[in-house]
Amino acid sequence: MNDRFERLLKSRIGLDASSVGSAVIERAVRQRMSGLALHDEDEYWMRLNGSPGEVQALIEAVVVPETWFFRYPESFTTLARLAFERLPSLGGGRALRILSLPCSTGEEPYSIVMALLDAGLSEYLFEVDALDVSARVIERASLGVYGRNSFRGDELGFRDRHFSEVAEGYQLAEQVRRKVRFRCGNLLDPGLLAGEAPYDFVFCRNLLIYFDRPTQSEVVEVLKRLLRPDGAMFIGPAEASLLSQHGMQPIGVPLSFVFRRTSEAPRGARPKAVSDGARPVVAAAVERASIRPSPPPPAKPRQRLSSLVPPASGQPLASPVGEFDEIARLADAGQHREARAACERQLAARGPSATVFYWLGLLSDVAGQEQEAQDFYRKALYLEPQHAEALAHLAALLAARGDHAGARRLQQRAARGVNKDG
């Protein structure tokens, strides 16, 4: 297959063919040709050039969504904190505006809504827009019906609160669905959301790694245009260095991958804890939109906290959950050195642990120590080959370094594990 199809996808959606592999694009072309009963590439090429609808169909055959609810859970905890911090300054004049793109089949924007509702924020005080280049996934997202693969990790209390079991899987509650406005959109479109006010928070995670360098720079500038000057952007863990090159820097909340413009984010700045008095101020500002009493914050999902490898002595061990909570507390407080020390104590006391190596990988990732992070993720995967988050983080790091073949192998490995489990 000649590379004209790759060039077309590059021009339309910015896709760097090496990030997914030429075989993926060729398979999508063959799939579309078969669907149209065409046997000649030149004939299909003519059809593409004369049919915007067929271009969209090819894009949808190439873009295969891989997402789940509350991926990178610390991001959603941080979003809730930042939202409560920001609301009093709005004085009830408008709702918080949040953008998710690409939204894929809806797990991310719906997670945003559930996180804010569960944190105690009234549904009248925020609005969520969700964009994707694929009309097909937008249609699926609007239905709000999900299978088991969309629910990963051990903490699934949100599913009990916001979903009902149906024959097809799990149906999302109408209260959550109605808060998201879905639409098709292309980040390379110069007029994208031109008539919309900028957003307080923008989620664009694990997309930039699929672009070449010039397209990455172009897309970052589009995202900055969509973001308020004092807004916050949530990205994927492997994309931090790119944003740092474009006048953005992390706000200092570990494992959340949140950035602001440099002028808005003094080094080491962290969102202030929400005071007890902040919520009544917000409630008074918006008639009928009082904030309901906040339930205790849901526990953060952690990957397989009980999957420890016992030491050689084989002596029974006490439950390590409290010690892992201590690591999480230190990391969330920005005490990285102390969190690392706690991990080292765990390794010395209990022997190799996939969870501890995963935590060390995250801490290295956040610190920008990419090679060290890779080493720790690989150690976690040696002990637990299907550790979903270690696979996802390592794949993102490899893709960011240009090792797209290695990233694809890890993504395929993760998909095999999910299909086996679900």
Swiss-Prot record:
The keyword Disulfide bond does not apply. InterPro entries: Bact_Chemotaxis_MeTrfase (IPR050903), CheR_C (IPR022642), CheR_MeTrfase (IPR000780), SAM-dependent_MTases_sf (IPR029063), TPR-like_helical_dom_sf (IPR011990), TPR_rpt (IPR019734). One of its GO terms (biological process) is chemotaxis. S-adenosyl-L-methionine binds at residues 67, 71, 108, 132, 186-187, 205-206. SUPFAM superfamilies: S-adenosyl-L-methionine-dependent methyltransferases, TPR-like. Monomer. This is Probable biofilm formation methyltransferase WspC. The lineage of its organism: Bacteria, Pseudomonadati, Pseudomonadota, Gammaproteobacteria, Pseudomonadales. The gene is wspC.
